[in-house]
Design a protein with these regions (language model features):
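Conserved catalytic/dimer-interface elements of ABC ATPase nucleotide-binding domains
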Residues: 108
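Hydrophobic anchor residue in the Rossmann-like NAD(P) cofactor-binding loop of oxidoreductases
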Residues: 89
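A short glycine-leucine-enriched loop at secondary-structure breakpoints
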Residues: 98-102
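Proteins that catalyze or organize thiol-disulfide redox chemistry
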Residues: 1-53, 59-62, 69-81, 93-94, ...
Length: 141
């Protein structure tokens, strides 16, 4: 639920858009990184034609904030091969429950609509790249 302060900021265009809505929301962060809400998750992740890496995070989570630049760097290296998606679990508790995410940050590697690997906790760039290359059988560009 949106707090009064966030509501007022959103009303006057001073806050970031709320991802908790009754409509699917996909927000492009850059050319290969997107933030989605739970209503857009199936279309953007489960039904995606390419492999997808999902960053399950929360805004208040310090390790998630530390992981964010690593996730963005790796997303740039696999453009046109792997799609990268972020989902705020505070606003998408149904996704956390469905995919058994109990700690954050958690990275989910999806291929053909199924989770092929789950990385829990802060993941280094090298470990993330190794997992992507092993699970999806690809190399960075």
């Amino acid at each position: 639920m949106m707090g009064l302060g966030n509501f007022i900021k959103g009303l006057f265009g001073k806050g970031e858009p709320s991802m908790s809505t009754s409509e699917p929301v996909t927000e492009a962060i850059n050319t290969n990184l997107y933030k989605v809400n739970s209503l857009a998750f199936e279309q953007e992740v489960v039904k995606a034609e390419t492999p997808v890496v999902v960053d399950c995070f929360a805004k208040w989570c310090a390790p998630c904030k530390k992981m964010a630049p690593v996730f963005e760097e790796v997303a740039a290296e696999y453009e046109n091969q792997v799609k990268f998606v972020k989902i705020d679990l505070d606003q998408s508790k149904d996704i956390a429950k469905q995919y058994h995410v109990v700690g954050i940050p958690t990275l989910l590697l999806f291929d053909s609509g199924e989770v092929k690997e789950k990385l829990v906790g802060n993941t280094t760039k090298d470990k993330l790249k190794a997992s992507i290359e092993e699970v999806f059988k690809i190399k960075s560009e």
